[in-house]
Every structure is written in C-alpha cells, then in structure tokens.
Swiss-Prot record:
Family: Belongs to the EFR3 family.
PANTHER family: PROTEIN EFR3 (PTHR47766:SF1)
Biological processes, Gene Ontology terms: protein localization to plasma membrane
Phosphoserine carried by residues: S227, S564, S625, S632, S643, S675, S735, S771, S774
Anything else known: Present with 1670 molecules/cell in log phase SD medium.
Protein name: Protein EFR3
Organism: Saccharomyces cerevisiae (strain ATCC 204508 / S288c)
One Pfam match: EFR3
Modified residues (Phosphothreonine): T231, T687, T690
Keyword tags: Phosphoprotein
GO cellular component annotations of the record: cell periphery; mitochondrion; plasma membrane
InterPro entries given in the database record: EFR3, EFR3_HEAT-like_rpt
Amino acid sequence: MQLSMRMMFTPKHQKLVNQCYPTGRTTDKKPKSSETSYLLYYVNSRRSKLEKVSTYLIKRSTSDLNHRRIGNIAVTLDLMNKIVLHCKENLNVFVKDFLYIMNKVLSNNNFNNDVSVVELIELAFSSICQNLDDVLCNGDMEFVQLYQNFVDLFFKIVTERIHNDDMLLKCCIDISNTNSVSSNPQLNHFVSKSVAYTISKFQERNPKFKTLSLEAALESNLGKRLSRTQTRTIGLDKAAEDNHDLSVKALQSYFNTTETDKLNLSIRTLLRCLQSTPNKELLEFVCNGIPVQLRYIVILLLVRQLSDKDKNVNPIVSLKLMSSLLVSDVSIVGLSVLDIMRKLLNFQLKNATNKEVVAQSCITMTDLNHKTYYAEQTSDMLYELLLKLKSDTVKDVEKNAVVEDIDFLVEHITQPSISLELFIDLAHYMKNHIICLFNIVETEVPSSILFSKLYSLLRELDSHGVQKEMMEEIFDKYGKMALLSGLNYFLENVSEPEYTYYSYHLQAANFLKLNDYKSQTEYKMQTRTLFTKEDLLSYYSDTGSNKYSKKGAQILLSRDNQISTSDLLSDSQVRTTPLEYKNVPNAIFSNGKAVYDNNDFAAKQNKFDNSIDDNIEEANDTVISDANAKGSIYRFVAEDARSWKTMRATAPKVSDLKKTMNEKNIPNNMKRDGSFRGSQSVKSRVTNITFLLNELKTFSDDANKIKDPDEENIVGLDKIDVARSNSLRLAPISSLSDRSSIGNRKSFLQKTATGENQNDDFKDANEDLHSLSSRGKIFSST
C-alpha cells in the first residue's frame, strides 16, 4: 500500500527512468529496450525534462554505489550513453551531471576494478567527447575541472588497477576527438600525455620501431635508392586502413589531422620520445600519416630542438633524424629551404669547435638539397654559403667549416644547377675541387666578360694538370664559345709564354681537328714563343677546314678585345674594321649604273673629322655620317664594336655627285632631259634644304640645278619649306606663322643669290594645291 502510494506521487521522469531498470541483483544487467525508447522519446519531446533526468540519475547512482548494485550502475551508464547520443544538441544541459556520475563510479574501489563497468564508462565518455562544442572547453571552468579529474582518474585506473592497454588507447582516442582540447592551456597537456602512451604501446606491439636506428641516411648509389623505394614500408596513412590495432588508430587520430595546435603538440611529443629511443623508421612511419602540406612542421621542430636548452635533447640525434627524413620517400611540400639552411649554418658556426656537430650539420645541409623544392634551390644554397665566406665577421675556423660544407654539397649534386658567375666566385675558395664544381655549371651561354674571368681564373691555378683538365671541360661544355672567346682573350691578355696559353691552343686544335695547328702549338710550346696574328689567321682563312674561320678572322682583325656574346653567336654578321670599308656606290645614274669612289669617300670622312672645329659655322651645310658627327655617341666608340644596325653604308652626298660628274667631263650646257638624279637613298636622307641650296650655289648655270626628269622647268619649293629652310639658316626655329610668311620667303631668295649674272628665281607652287605643306619632299610635280 505504501509502495503504491509512493509511486502515485512520483514525478513522471523518475517513473520513466526507474522503469528502465530490470529487477534482480545480477551484474550483467541492461536497460529494458521498450522503456528506454520511451524515455528517449520523452526527453527529446520535452527538453526541459533533461536536467531533471540527469539530476535524478545522480541520486539513483549514488544510492546504487552505496548499496554496491553493480548491475544498476551498469544500466545507469548505458542509459547515459544513449541519452548523449539522442540529445546531443542539448549536451551542455546535462553533461556536467554525467561527468560527475562517472567520476563517482571511477573513484569507488568496489567498481573501478570491474572491466565491464570501466568499458561502459569509456563508452559514455567517448560519446560525450565526440559531441562536445568549443564553449564548454574554453568557457566553463566547472566542466574543465570535471573533465580534467575524470581523465586523470581514468588513466590511473587503466594503468594501475586493470592494466588494460586497449582501454587506455580508447581513452587516448577519445581525448583526440574532443574539440579544442589542444587549444585549452588547462587541458592540452592531455594531448602530449596521450601521444606518449600511444607511441609506447605502438612500440611494444612493433618492436622494430623501438630499436636504435640512426645509420647514415645519405646514399649516393642510385640503385640502392631505387631498391629502398621499391621495398618501402607501409606508412601510417596506409596501415590504418587494413589494421585493427588500436595503437595505429590512436596515432592516426593525433597525426592525421589539420588541427595545427594538436599536430604541433603531437609532433613535439614524438620527437621527445625519439630522443630516448632514436628510430628513423618510426619517424618516417608517423610522418606518412601527417597531411602532406603540414609535414614541414616536423623539420621546423627538429631545427628548433637544436636551440633547445633542455639537457635531454641531443643535437646529433636531432640532426640525424632530420637527415633521415629529408632523404626518405616521405613527400614534403612548402619547406623553406633557405630558412632551414641559415639556422643549420648558424648552429654549426656557433659550435665550430665541436667536430661531430660540424660534420653532422654539413651532412644535414647536403641532405636538405636531396629533393628539389624549387628551380634555383641549389644555386641559392651555394650563394648563401658564399655570403658567409665573404663576411668579415666570420672567423677562420668558421670559414673552414663553410668550405667543407660547399665541398660536400657539390660532391652530391648530380645535375648542372649553378651559373658560371657563381662558379667563378666559389672557385677562389675551393681550388682543390674546382673540376667537381665546374661539372655542375649550367651550359647556358654566358657573356664575354664572364669568359674573360674564367680564363683569368684558369691562369691563377697552380697545377698544370688541373689547368689542362679544366680547359678540356670548358671546351666540352661550351664548344664554339670557348674557342672564339679564348682566341680573343689570349690574343689580348697574354704577352709572355705560359702553360694556359698553350693548353688553350692545343684544345682549340683538337676541337677544330687541325693537325697542323696542333703540331705548331707543340713546337711553340717547346720554343717558348707565341703565335702572331698572321700565324693564327692561317688557321682561320679556310672555311672548308675550319667552319669558324669567318668569326675567328673577325676577332683577329678587330681592334677591340671585348667581343660580345651576340657577335660570337651570330654567323651572318660582318664586322667592319677601321682599315676596311664596305664597297658601296657613291651615286647611281638614271640608267642604273653605280659609281664607286670609296678611297675618296674615306679621305673625306677623315678630312671632315679634322676640320669640323674650324668650320663650325658651316655645320648646317655639310652632311656628316653618324659615325663621324662630333655630337654623336658613336664618335667615341670603335667601329668594330658597334652593333650591326650602325654599320649600314653611309649615303652619298651631293658633293660626291658633283665630283663624279666633273670626272666624267659632263658639259655645263647639257640637256635637261639627260641630267642625272640622285639615288633613292639621297631622296630619303637629304632633307635639309639649306644644305641643298648651298651645294647648288657652287655649281654651274644648268648642271648645278637638280631637275625633275619629267619636267622642263625647275619645280618651285613649297612656301612652308622655303620658310623653314630660311629659319634654319638665319634664325632659331620660329612659330608656324613666321614660317609661313611670304615676306620671309622673298628676303630669303634675295640672300641666297648664287652669282652676279645668274638668275636662279624660284617659282611658287600652284595655289590651287589641296595640301598646304610638302615638308619632307624634294621633288614634286605640277
């Protein structure tokens, strides 16, 4: 009667909870399925009852703990798990009550040694961790304290009382699944603790990852590298797919993540474990499970360990682990090679007196170049080492370490990757390994200045054997460019017999396959004499036996010793020397016949150069070529050093036309229809009207007038052209209105009278012309 009355006044949520418990005192109880389903429906439809249900579960579990009802505690834990899964949207309402219940159960020695009870606790905790939001972890201090107490207690129970490794690994996975636990300073130590437990259990289950394994990572034999690639062990990324080992899954939960806070803590813990048991296979196995875009963090943290003041950190172990990872098959992207190298180099130089650190740092920097992360990587690394060598603050012992770094790095470079300029800079510091350094120089054609520096460097070498081998390598790499640039260099810079001089000519003879050239070089080497230009021209005169004859002769006849690379590469270019002029026509008659007078033309050029200062007032009346103009930039440049665009033929002048006609004895009263006219180059180039009128002034009555071949009368100049020529002769350039003045035109015609008895009036063009200007035209038709 009392029981029925008590049930009558019991709240509904308590009735529903109590109905889920089966009767009896067995330890393997489970909640009734139908009653549990109704309870879940009830709390889902009436969310306000969730807090009342969780509060009642605390009261019910406390009573069961006091009476040691293990079966009822098991039912309570199972109900909690189901409520979490079905009401996860409102987890914040009851999660603290549930954590309180689990803590009470774990702290009771009558229950915490029961594996089934601990498993149910872990299952409920796993559901909670998977559905927690960031607010509880970062803002609710009560929840943080409950969470912290539970994890500490759980780790203690599973490691000290029940000794269940799987339960421990499951809890580690649950912690990994908790949102924002790694960003909370009060909880993130659980990440490191969980990773340490996980790695320890993984090594126990896989003993090969626990042994000491730090042998030399660098292997130069390609066959061994291929063999290692083909027998590559499965990494963490592949092992978890077909492996049910909880230690592997736990490792994957911590390392196969893009949450950088958690990954950072996990990698730090891994590296601390590897300090005690160094094993490069374990490092590679775990790194394969890290997302490829984040694997560079491992290298960064290994470098950071070098500056760690922790006595437990051995820098040699860190360097060897880094080397093993850099040369392994683990793909790494986004690695800042130069930043890593600078830190390694600074660490090496700070410990320059420690030979073991210096040697291992050298190996690690070389391993850093094992994979190419960007195009100019090798060149940049060598340039960084070169800067250290050139630094004034670096001591001698430190410079020796840097030179060893360069030697070891160059020794393991297999592809041409540096410029000739960088080679020349580095060669001064490593003359004992200059051949090995030259082998990695790119075959791109350098400038003539670099070739000069290269041959100068060659002359500075002490060993004749090295000089000979270097000369062979230069010809093998550059061929034609080595031949022609060397011909130019040794012709201009060597005046005394020396071994490099003869070594060049021997290689040139072998390159050209000229036995006579070779025997002559050997003879001159014995007699200690040098080649003359005439001697060398004999080998560069026959294009049949020497296809580089044209270029070689051009160099030998040139005054200037700085022949540009473009000149050496161009086969069609013809260089003009000061003693040779192109055979260009001075004038062309109307019948197409050309008149040549190059000797007189050359003499006139020299005459103009010498007299230009004395005749400055008549500068407007003289046409001077670009090469001889006093204000021209080409006046101070040797003719054989100009580009091919400036070597075009100089246009003939009207004075040359007059001289040609006088030499042909053309009468002054010749018929107008038989008069000559200038070539097309004269029409296009002679635009200065003042010059034209001055030349007409010294000619005879009829022959001195340039006539239109189709007209009987002299064609008058346009008004604007007349005004323009007047302004050019008499005054500075005026405005357009002044130039178009008719008065100026008349005064100009009066001042330019050619003689007392000569009538040389000009007629204006017809006024009905549509164009008001004919500027740039010499001839026009009416």
